[in-house]
């Protein structure tokens, strides 16, 4: 089976793992996925992630984060910019997602970063996904 949107597949696997109350989730690695996971870890949405080779393919295993009473740290995670319809935004057009309780993840000329970091660097770019 060929996949056209690997990032959407990763986000769906993470969303489904949280719904199933799993501790870990794994999927094939790529540079963009690793960059997105780095932002999610820096913002406190996941515990950690590791890349391991399996059968000549590198897989990433993500350890999900839950609160003390078992609530997921991610309520919603959705793809915004898709292969068929790219979404770009200037930094002045990005308002705080869920009253600044959530984040947008952007691909900018300076790398993949959250909207908060993009505001500090005053740079816009492609809106990859939104997380709350």
UniProtKB/Swiss-Prot annotation:
Gene3D superfamilies: 3.30.1370.30, 3.30.1490.10. One of its GO terms (cellular component) is ribosome. The keyword rRNA-binding applies. This is Small ribosomal subunit protein uS8. Coiled coil: none annotated. GO terms for biological process: translation. Keywords: Ribonucleoprotein, Ribosomal protein, RNA-binding, rRNA-binding. It holds the Pfam family Ribosomal_S8. One of its GO terms (molecular function) is structural constituent of ribosome. The gene is rpsH.
């Amino acid at each position: 089976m060929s996949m056209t949107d690997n990032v959407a597949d990763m986000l769906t696997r993470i969303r489904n793992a949280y719904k199933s109350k799993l501790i870990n989730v794994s999927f094939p690695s790529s540079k963009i996925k690793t960059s997105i996971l780095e932002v999610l870890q820096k913002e406190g949405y996941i515990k950690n992630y590791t890349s391991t080779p399996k059968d000549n393919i590198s897989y990433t295993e993500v350890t999900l984060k839950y609160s003390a009473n078992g609530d997921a740290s991610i309520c919603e995670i959705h793809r915004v910019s898709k292969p068929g319809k790219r979404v770009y935004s200037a930094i002045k057009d990005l308002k705080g997602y869920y009253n600044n309780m959530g984040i947008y993840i952007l691909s900018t000329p300076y790398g993949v970063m959250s909207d908060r970091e993009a505001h500090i660097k005053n740079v816009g770019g492609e809106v990859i996904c939104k997380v709350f």
